[in-house]
Amino acid sequence: MTYQKVATMVASIGVPYAYYQFPVGTAQPTPFVCFYFDGSNDLYADDTNYQKIRPLTIELYTDNKDFALEATVEGILSSNGLTFARSESWIDSERMNMVVYTTDVIITS
């Protein structure tokens, strides 16, 4: 999967999205998504990286629990052949629900 394909996949969720965070001063109403690559888990040996593997995090923010939107995100990940883990928390100071999806993406040219 290319980096552009990942961005297109995130866009297909159908809510505002940004890489890592929205620009300062552009607070988004919920729901919205932030996504980012968190390091690397490349396959390498003999001083050569053979395969780029990037841990992808997708954070879904909503006012309240949104089962339908979560199902949309999970369906998009699954239809793109990505297995994922999820966690959820309530951000009391922001009065928001956050669902975090993590997966590994094999990056191609």
List each language-model region with its residue ranges.
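A generic structural micro-feature
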Residues: 27, 48-52, 95-97
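Short amphipathic alpha-helical segments, especially helix-boundary/capping motifs
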Residues: 20, 31-34, 46-51, 63, ...
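Short, surface-exposed, polar/charged, turn-prone segments marking secondary-structure boundaries
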Residues: 45-48, 60-65, 85-89
